[in-house]
């Protein structure tokens, strides 16, 4: 297949996956946006975590809340647990990589907070440990996942919200995760501040 055809194929696959996700995920994204907005109204914050590209997504989400998304508004409290290399490496060295997010959740998380847990497979041990730690702290969890939801799906409590992308392709899952993050940011802004 020539480069042009490969590029077109990627676009078509992305469009198909987003169309399936639109049908399958609208309600769960709306539920997650409402849950997050309620937490922020109750003076809670949103902690986020993930590995690799999902770490970048966690940081992207936090930056949109802390700064602004598409409207002028005050900053909102959000912390990406993926950014402090001293903390991450000290926890990994002294305990294990499995604990790098969970220890931060236990230190920073309160019952009114939300954990945004991002894993394309649901099999990321350190993200799953963070989900368990969030529950220990009385927090709700919004899980961005894909494939069959993996181990993370089985860890979720009744009040948690899973946004599971209907795909087995990591790149397509990541593309929908970014769109879902933008939808969540918009829903939070609309809920808290009304129309732009």
From Swiss-Prot:
PANTHER family: DNAA INITIATOR-ASSOCIATING PROTEIN DIAA, SEDOHEPTULOSE 7-PHOSPHATE ISOMERASE / DNAA INITIATOR-ASSOCIATING FACTOR FOR REPLICATION INITIATION. It is found in: Cytoplasm. It comes from Alkalilimnicola ehrlichii (strain ATCC BAA-1101 / DSM 17681 / MLHE-1). It catalyses: 2 D-sedoheptulose 7-phosphate = D-glycero-alpha-D-manno-heptose 7-phosphate + D-glycero-beta-D-manno-heptose 7-phosphate. Coiled coil: none annotated. The lineage of its organism: Bacteria, Pseudomonadati, Pseudomonadota, Gammaproteobacteria, Chromatiales. InterPro entries: GmhA/DiaA, Phosphoheptose_Isoase, SIS_dom, SIS_dom_sf, SIS_GmhA/DiaA_subfam. Homotetramer. This is Phosphoheptose isomerase. Binds 1 zinc ion per subunit. Its EC number is 5.3.1.28. The reaction produces a racemic mixture of D-glycero-alpha-D-manno-heptose 7-phosphate and D-glycero-beta-D-manno-heptose 7-phosphate.
